[in-house]
Amino acid sequence: MSFVTTNDGVQIFYKDWGPKDAPVIFFHHGWPLSADDWDAQMMFFLGEGFRVIATDRRGHGRSEQVWDGHDMDHYADDTAAVVKHLGIQGAVHVGHSTGGGVVARYI
């Protein structure tokens, strides 16, 4: 499994599928879901030649279960940590429910 450590020390799980030089689509799940909820969409876009990424937001799925940091500022910072770790530039961000709020705060 793949993880990145955020600036405040939280372990965030991520999926990163596809060619590293392909256009990137980054998926953000809703509450109380996980990255797995995007698998069908990720498989579709992977088949179309995209690099697809999804995370389990802090406190969800395989990411570290923490009591604090459950706000849009931390979620956006967590996204930035994954983007930096993976060296992503120019990604399209797609969010559902709370994930949409994360996208709005991040961009």
Please identify what each model-predicted range represents.
Residues 39, 76-80, 104:
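Generic alpha-helical structural signal
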Residues 100-107:
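Short glycine-enriched nucleophile-adjacent loop
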Residues 7, 47, 51-94, 98:
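Active-site loop/oxyanion-hole signature of alpha/beta-hydrolase fold enzymes
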Residues 1-11:
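N-terminal cap/lid segment of alpha/beta-hydrolase-fold proteins
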Residues 10-65:
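Conserved HGGG/HGGXW glycine-rich cap/lid loop of the alpha/beta-hydrolase fold
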